[in-house]
Amino acid sequence: MNKEILAVVEAVSNEKSLPREKIFEALEIALATATKKKYEQEIDVRVSINRKTGNFSTFRRWMVVDIVVHPTKEITLEAACFEGEQVKINDYVEDKIESVNFDRITTQTAKQVIVQKVREAERAMLVDQFRKHIGQIITGIVKKISRDNLTLDLGNNAEALILREGMLPRENFRPGDRIRGILYGVYPEARGAQLFLSRSKTEMLIELFRIEVPEIGEEVIEIKAAARDPGSRAKIAVKTNDKRIDPIGACVGMRGARVQAVSSELCGERIDIILWDDNPAQFVINAMAPADVVSIIVDEDHHTMDIAVDSSNLAQAIGRNGQNVRLASQISGWELNVMTTEDLRSKHKEEAYAAFNIFKKNLNVSEKVIKTLVKEGFSSLEELAYIPLNELLEINNLTEREVQLVREGAKNGLLLLELDQKNQIKNKKIEQALLNVNGMNELLALKLAEKNIFTVEELANQGIDDLIDIENLNSEQAGLLIMAARNICWFSSKV
């Protein structure tokens, strides 16, 4: 039997390309499992196989614990020490017992356990092999097609899944087709396929350019950002520190060969290659291509930009179903508002008029000073109250006394506004817990109250579309606010 064990280990190790130690461990677990089945009680068993001779010994063991819950598998520290053992908590006390004989049932049990453990070892080895390839493009053969996913054969007994959302909208595959995808997930705990590929992720686009454009692989050209509407359109931003190289031309290739190769792999996805710029406004202008931007106004406080285009160019700037401006927003990370030059002029005229009235109400200065402040781009009391004093003093035609009056008036106006807000909150009976929601302030609470939202629970029941029309609240902020309320209301024991 000893030689048979060594022969089994050698054979399985060679057949499965697994280390001999993994097979020995599987055998030990298999023999321990077979031994346990010989006892009516639930016991803990350990088997040790000599790696050189194949001899094996069997031990029944008890874990040392403070309080015994399972008497057949546990022993107290006092009892273990009484028997002369030098142990501590979580150690094991062992007694050698008779090893199991290999009858039909024992052999069948051992075989089942060995098969299971070998599969687990193969799965672990597969995970180790592919984990270092996460973020790279993998090629596979379509093995099976189901409603929700594709199963790919990667070779060497490795399989991968492409989920439905990881495919492009118009893609149709047949068994035997060779396809490529970006490896994004390796999950050792999963049953069956543990490798997940995607063709819709932005990283797929980036890696395809890295393959097709040698200058990117050599890091002469850098991909700074990318955004995709998978299978339809994409934008990718590139830059280079080598002034001799045209990064856009290098990515397009001779007669468009390089970008066409990427586009063909992605079902004809149209790709705009744009030049990266460290200046956010200039980068957004580049990202809006092929539309021509007439003017752009940046609101850093709200991380938004107002973009003006000619009325004849508005449809192109927005794109079909808002695609062009949406991709430009994704690749830049800014919220973009596209409008005609006439609409932008009208909007800023309204904003200037509103700012003029606020300043006139709160600042004890002449209309000439107020017009100067509005012309300089100031639109709120907060800006005037907290802007560095030296910046106010640098404004032409303003005296030190006028600057002092502006600063005092702005701060007093904010205090009165805060007091008014507190009174309104009290009168509207806004719940105090609503004011404690992460991201909430008194002004926002009042705007919610105008929508009959007075409590955390009422906020938690809202959708982003319900709040998106609130001034100075974008969709991301609205989503975070709602989730903060839901965390308090739905997932906390107290509100």
Curated annotation (Swiss-Prot):
* Domain KH, chain residue ranges per copy: 302-370
Which GO cellular component terms are attached? cytosol
Source organism superkingdom: Bacteria
Q: Which Pfam families match?
A: HHH_5, KH_5, NusA_N
An example GO BP is: DNA-templated transcription termination
Task: Name the gene behind this protein.
Answer: nusA
Molecular function terms from GO: DNA-binding transcription factor activity; nucleotide binding; RNA binding
- Enumerate the SUPFAM superfamilies for this protein: Nucleic acid-binding proteins, Prokaryotic type KH domain (KH-domain type II), Rad51 N-terminal domain-like, Transcription factor NusA, N-terminal domain
Q: Where is this region: 2 X 51 AA approximate repeats?
A: 364-489
Q: Where is the S1 motif domain?
A: 135-200
Q: Which family does it belong to?
A: Belongs to the NusA family.
Note the segments forming the sequence repeats. Answer: 364-414, 439-489
UniProtKB keywords: Cytoplasm, Repeat, RNA-binding, Transcription, Transcription antitermination, Transcription regulation, Transcription termination
> What is the name of this protein?
Transcription termination/antitermination protein NusA
Question: Subcellular localization, per the record?
Answer: Cytoplasm
Q: Where does this chain mainly localize?
A: cytoplasm
HAMAP family (UniProt xref): NusA_B (MF_00945_B)
Under the heading InterPro entries, the entry gives: DNA_repair_Rad51/TF_NusA_a-hlx, KH_dom, KH_dom-like_a/b, KH_dom_NusA-like, KH_sf_prok-type, NA-bd_OB-fold, NusA_bac, NusA_N_sf
Q: Does the keyword Signal apply?
A: no
What's the subunit arrangement here? Monomer. Binds directly to the core enzyme of the DNA-dependent RNA polymerase and to nascent RNA.
- State the protein's purpose: Participates in both transcription termination and antitermination.
